[in-house]
Amino acid sequence: MLKLKGTIRALAAAGGIAVVTLAAVPALASSGHAAKPTTGPEVISGTVHGKKALANKTIIPLKLTGLVATRSSVTLGGSGAQKGNNKTLKTAAGNLTVKIAAKPQSTQSFNRKTCREAFTQDIVVSVVGGRSTGAFAGASGPGAVQIFFRATAPRFTSGPHKGQCDTNGQPRVKGAVASFLASVVLTTR
């Protein structure tokens, strides 16, 4: 479980960085010159499989739909998400700052029959328009981010534990997945 836990810890720590990326991109819907506020949904999603999901710094390409149809990416790794922290994403359209509005909620599961381990972290955010710049200046709105990771531990091939899950071993590449999903109700000015 040590190697799986290390990968899961890295993904959990990435929550703070991921939150910024997922909440930030919807603000691209506004040029910052709109006469009146525009409010709408933005869904941001991305998934990687295999070696890319198990990398020390997992990079997930993101597709954005809703107010803005564009692409981006997020790198999992770094400081973790904590309630009250501000996270800033720098983009060509400006900087978007979000605040982690509640303590992130994490769940883990492990199936001893299949050796499958899963980790999910849910993070509630709110856009901080006063600390955002460019197209994001003055933006507001609530959002939710989910980071998901799943992998299979190898099995012992010999010895007294033969056939059992080797939770200290490197997770198997086949079937490994890391994903991001975010939904933001964004109001731009």
PLM regions with names:
Residues M1-S30:
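Secretory targeting and sorting signals
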Residues S30-R189:
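Beta-strand-enriched cores of mature, soluble protein domains
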